[in-house]
Amino acid sequence: MENLYQEQESNYKTLFSMAMSTKKLFLVFFLALVMSPVFPAQVDDMMIRDHLRKIYQITGMSIPEKDSPEYPKILFVDQDFIEQMACKGEACDAPAFTKGPTVFMADDLDLEEILGESILYHELVHVLQYYNYGRNDGCKSWSKRELQAYQLQEEFVNERGYDMPWLRSVTHYLAAMCDRWHK
């Protein structure tokens, strides 16, 4: 029980630092109080490192050191939290989002299934994009990064013998998504 309390306290510290960087302090604290607990994902660190190395091999984006504050942190959250933070409170289909080095994943995703693991891979692309290039500076930057993340996710899925046609079609909607979420 002590360990669970420490993990949850660490998660609230992550939420607090995110709030300070986005100036959404009230919203984040409100969500932290009313949402279901945030739990660190039980993700094998070797999986994360393997994915980061693969992304590096393809893109050349450098990887933060494991003990760096920029090294990825994976947290499971409920869908309401994702909708509040990634979709400005509107209902959306986003199963995850990334803020700096922190990946927030819907708590119903299974990382042992190809969909869940490929979404983690997609979000790790965003972690490395942030680490290498900083924040998005607008819709054009956001669209380019999303396009790269979806293309790498599709390669990841295909290499494992799966096909997810929606990965190819979603890139056609990036401009509309940009207008909706990144005004």
PLM regions: where:
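Short alpha-helix carrying the canonical HExxH Zn2+-binding catalytic motif
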Residues: 113-128
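Bacterial N-terminal signal peptides
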Residues: 28-34
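Auxiliary, metal-adjacent structural segments of Zn-dependent hydrolase domains
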Residues: 41-103, 110-113
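Bacterial N-terminal signal peptides that target proteins for export
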Residues: 18-26
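N-terminal amphipathic/basic-hydrophobic helices that include classical n-h-c signal peptides
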Residues: 1-19, 161
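Post-HExxH zinc-binding segment in Zn-dependent metallohydrolases
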Residues: 139-172
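Catalytic Zn2+-binding segment of zinc metalloproteases
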Residues: 124-140
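Second-shell loop/turn segments in exported
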Residues: 106-110, 136-142
